[in-house]
C-alpha cells in the first residue's frame, strides 16, 4: 500500500490502513448491522488519524558488510558458506572445540541413510577453504551492542582473551540440547535405561557381529527392548515428571528417529523382541511415513498408550527373568492391561533450547514460552527476530531435522545478503522523538527504555548561552516501543506515526456522536 502511495507522488507514510476485513467482516459474520457500524467507526478513526499524519523519512545507517554467525552446527556452517559464496565476510563462532554439533554423532540421516559425520565433514571442508570465513573455536559471544548495520560483538576465548568485532548482522544458530530425564523418570538412572541419542550413537558405531548387550553396555543378555516416545516433550502438568521445566511442545524429529532405531535394532538383532510404546507417532515430513511402515514390517510391535495416561517403568521382582517391566494400557487392543518384561529401555528424549542465555540477553532476541528463540511470524518472517539485523537459523528457533535446519540457515543468509547489499541499511521511521522545549531532563525515559543506547542526555545550548540537559533519541537504536512516552511527565516524547494526538483523534472519532456515516449505514442494513 505504501509503495502505491509513493508511486502516486506522496510520501509513503501519509497512509493509514483501516482494517475492516479481520476486525469486522471475518469477526462479525452473523451481525451485519453491528458489523457495518463498527466498520464505519474504524474508517472514521483512520480518517481522523490520516488528517494529522506528517511526512516521514526512513532511518538510514551505514552498513558494515560483515556477519557474525553464532553456532558451528549444520545450520551455522550452511549460513556461513552461503554468505561467503555471495562475497560477504563471515565470523563463525563456536563455543566448543570443533565444528559439526550434534550431527556428528548421527549414524544415519533420513532419507539418504548418509552418516551424519559424512554430511558435516563436507560442510566443514568447504568452510575450511573459504577465505571469507573466519572460524573462532572455543569462543563465546559475551556482549552485543549497536544496531542493524553496525553492531559491536565482544568475543571471549576460553583462555580469557577478548576481542571486539564490527559486524552488520547476526545469525543465531545456537542449536539445541538433548533433554535429560530427571532421576527416576521412566526408570532413568538404571543402567538398563538409555536415552535415544546415547543408544543411537552406540548402535551405529557398533562393529558387525557385536551382541546387543555389549552395544548397549549392559550386563546379561538383551532379549527384549522397549522404546518409549515423548520423554521430555508433549508434557502435561500432573501427568509427566519434568526435569525443572514443563515442555508442552512436540520435538518433531523423535518419532522418526525412534522408529528407525527400532527397525535397525530388529535388522541387526532379529532374535530380539522390539516394542514401540507411544501416545502418537508423528513421522511428519514427506516420505517419513515409510520409516514407520518399515519398522512395522521388520517385526517391531506397537503399543499405544491412552493420551491421558503414561506408561510406568518398574523394576521386576527378583524371581523374574527380565529385570524391568513396562506397564500400560493399550488402545490398539481396546484398553487391555499390558505388562511388558524387557531387558533394555530406550527413552526417546526431545530437544530443549541450546543454553545460550547470555547471548540471548546480549542481543535481546525474544524467546517463546518454550524457551526457543522467537521469530517475528512463522509464515511471513520465519527467520527474523524482533531485533532488526538479528536472524535465526536451525534448531535455535525450535525442533527440526537437518534438512529444515540447513534450509532455514540459507533463508537467514539470504535475508542478511539482502539487508547488507547496499552501503546503507534502511529502517522504518516509527521511532521516538523528543520536543526539547517540553523536556525537563527528569531521566524517566532513560530508566524506562529497554534498549541500550536508544535514549541519552545531551547538553543543549538555549537562550543567552545557557547549557541544559535534554533527552536525545538515537533513531537507529530506538525500536519505537513507546515505553518512554508512557513515563514522560511533560509529554515531551512521541513516536513518529503514532503520536498521542493521533490516538486521541482516533478515540474521538470512534466514540463521538458525529459518526453519521455508520449510523446511516446501520439504518440502511436494518431496513433490508
Where are these regions (language model features)?
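Residues forming the flavin
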Residues: 1-528
Amino acid at each position: 500500500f505504501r509503495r502505491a502511495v509513493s508511486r502516486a507522488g506522496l510520501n509513503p507514510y501519509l497512509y493509514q490502513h483501516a482494517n475492516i476485513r479481520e476486525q469486522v467482516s471475518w469477526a462479525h459474520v452473523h451481525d451485519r448491522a453491528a458489523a457495518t457500524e463498527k466498520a464505519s467507526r474504524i474508517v472514521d478513526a483512520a480518517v481522523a488519524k490520516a488528517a494529522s499524519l506528517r511526512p516521514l523519512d526512513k532511518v538510514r545507517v551505514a552498513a558494515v558488510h560483515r556477519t557474525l554467525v553464532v553456532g558451528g552446527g549444520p545450520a551455522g556452517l550452511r549460513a556461513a558458506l552461503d554468505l561467503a559464496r555471495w562475497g560477504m565476510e563471515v565470523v563463525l563462532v563456536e563455543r566448543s572445540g570443533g565444528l559439526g554439533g550434534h550431527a556428528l554423532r548421527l549414524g544415519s540421516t533420513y532419507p539418504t541413510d548418509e552418516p551424519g559425520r559424512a554430511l558435516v565433514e563436507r560442510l566443514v571442508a568447504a568452510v575450511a577453504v573459504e577465505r571469507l570465513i573466519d572460524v573462532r573455536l572455543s569462543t563465546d559471544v559475551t556482549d552485543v551492542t549497536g544496531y542493524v548495520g553496525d553492531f559491536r560483538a565482544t568475543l571471549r576465548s576460553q583462555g580469557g582473551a577478548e576481542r571486539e568485532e564490527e559486524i552488520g548482522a547476526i545469525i543465531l544458530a545456537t542449536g539445541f540440547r538433548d533433554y535429560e530425564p530427571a532421576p527416576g523418570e521412566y526408570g532413568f538412572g538404571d543402567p538398563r535405561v538409555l536415552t535415544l541419542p546415547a543408544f543411537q550413537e552406540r548402535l551405529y558405531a557398533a562393529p558387525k557381529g557385536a551382541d546387543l548387550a555389549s552395544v548397549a553396555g549392559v550386563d546379561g543378555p538383551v532379549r527384549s527392548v522397549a522404546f518409549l516416545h515423548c520423554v521430555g516433550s508433549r508434557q502435561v502438568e500432573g501427568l509427566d515428571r519434568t526435569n525443572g521445566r514443563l515442555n508442552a511442545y512436540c520435538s518433531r524429529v523423535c518419532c522418526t528417529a525412534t522408529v528407525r532405531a527400532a527397525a535397525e535394532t530388529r535388522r541387526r538383532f532379529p532374535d530380539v523382541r522390539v516394542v514401540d510404546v507411544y501416545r502418537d507417532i508423528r513421522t511428519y515430513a514427506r516420505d517419513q511415513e515409510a520409516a514407520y511402515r518399515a519398522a512395522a514390517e521388520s517385526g517391531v510391535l506397537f503399543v499405544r498408550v491412552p493420551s491421558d495416561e503414561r506408561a510406568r517403568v518398574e523394576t521386576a521382582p527378583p524371581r523374574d527373568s527380565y529385570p524391568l517391566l513396562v506397564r500400560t494400557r493399550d488402545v490398539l487392543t481396546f484398553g487391555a492391561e499390558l505388562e511388558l518384561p524387557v531387558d533394555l529401555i530406550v527413552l526417546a528424549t526431545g530437544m530443549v533450547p541450546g543454553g545460550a542465555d547470555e547471548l540471548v540477553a546480549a542481543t535481546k532476541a525474544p524467546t517463546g514460552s518454550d524457551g526457543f528463540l522467537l521469530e517475528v511470524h512463522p509464515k511471513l518472517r520465519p527467520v527474523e527476530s524482533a531485533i532488526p539485523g538479528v536472524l535465526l537459523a536451525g534448531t535455535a528457533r525450535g525442533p527440526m531435522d537437518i534438512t529444515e535446519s540447513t534450509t532455514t540457515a540459507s533463508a537467514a543468509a539470504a535475508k542478511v545478503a539482502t539487508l547488507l547489499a547496499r552501503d546503507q541499511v534502511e529502517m522504518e521511521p516509527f521511532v521516538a522523538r523528543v520536543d526539547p522545549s517540553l523536556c525537563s531532563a527528569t531521566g524517566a525515559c532513560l530508566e524506562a527504555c529497554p534498549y541500550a543506547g536508544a535514549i541519552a542526555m545531551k547538553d543543549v545550548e538555549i537562550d543567552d548561552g545557557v547549557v541544559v540537559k535534554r533527552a536525545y533519541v538515537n533513531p537507529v537504536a530506538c525500536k519505537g516501543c513507546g515505553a518512554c512516552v508512557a513515563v514522560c511527565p511533560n509529554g515531551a516524547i512521541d513516536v513518529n506515526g503514532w503520536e498521542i494526538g493521533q490516538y486521541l483523534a482516533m478515540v474521538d472519532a470512534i466514540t463521538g456522536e458525529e459518526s453519521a456515516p455508520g449510523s446511516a449505514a446501520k439504518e440502511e442494513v436494518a431496513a433490508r
